Amino acid sequence: MNQRKIIHVDMDAFYASIEQRDHPEYRGKPIAVGRPEMRGVVAAASYEARRFGVRSAMPSMKALKLCPHLIFTRNRMDVYKAVSAQIHAIFHRYTDLVEPLSLDEAFLDVTENKPGIPLAVDIARRIKKEIRRELHLTASAGVSYNKFLAKIASDYRKPDGLFTIHPSRAEKFIAALPIEAFWGVGHATAERMRALSITNGAQLRARDKDFLVRHFGKTGAIFYNFARGVDDRPVEPSRMRKSVGCEETYRENVTRAEALEQRLPLLAEELAGRLARSGFRGNTLTLKVKFPDFVQKTRCATVPEILTEKEGILPLARTLMEELDSGDRTFRLLGLSVSHPQEEQRQGIWEQLWLELEY
């Protein structure tokens, strides 16, 4: 059976780069897309801003402390969506097997491509060149035989990078990866893995599937496969994502009071940042909890206004927590997500975002 040829394309500082492209006075300067207000969140940061530690999803006030001369520019989501459509038109010159992950990121299956180009790396090179020439933006691309490795490859030489992970080099490459680089390993999961003496791909590969499933649930089986370079997920052009969410599994169970006062505010802030980055608009909030015995419960509420900021999300999340009949039980997992997208978003699959396996 022939190996698949998968490309992951990730635009470089997409929103911020568009602002620098359209506003010459911003070029070479640290800029952030967002509002410089007490309640503001950075939706995107230029590479100049990132050198000061400014990151997307960061509160604007914190960003200004890190970089006092940071320039804020308003979010122009209509422009970002239009540019995203232009980028996708370039992708479709080569294949219709395009799976959008967000406005600025997509997988392409070029195993059978329209021009009949034999090498995927040549297609990636052409796509990058056409994006630069036609849109005056840069993209990073990763090439490999599955989605997991293609995504890692696109991050490897950012910005404006191109990197290939060949099947013959995959095992050695994965073995040296820090555990944080694995898709699905966020801060909390990385801490739990380090507590189990798993800090890189080689140590992850040394663990059997039962061990990983016991400690990480269903995701443990995914980690087991990733450590072996196995990822059979197809590129799905019709995939429609209808929510934005984040969740965290805790190394030590948290009390109800800790959840209300400490954990939910952090999740609400993270969710607000993801909503800002994605441009997703929805008005249904879902709270997900998992108890130490792995019993899971959810509560949701739909409100008239669109949920975009921590200040709107957190009170509603706390209300849902109060309504949850949990008694004095502790929690091993908490999660928040916004769904029920507006009709205008259902018209374009690249206008939606779901960050999978983040924790």
Curated annotation (Swiss-Prot):
Q: UmuC domain: from which residue to which, for each copy?
A: 6-186
Which reactions fall under this protein's catalytic activity? DNA(n) + a 2'-deoxyribonucleoside 5'-triphosphate = DNA(n+1) + diphosphate
* Residues at which Mg(2+) binds: D10, D104
Cofactor(s) this protein requires: Mg(2+)
Question: What PANTHER family does this protein map onto?
Answer: DNA POLYMERASE KAPPA (PTHR11076:SF33), DNA REPAIR POLYMERASE UMUC / TRANSFERASE FAMILY MEMBER (PTHR11076)
Indicate the family of this protein: Belongs to the DNA polymerase type-Y family.
Oligomeric state and partners?
Monomer.
Name of this protein? DNA polymerase IV
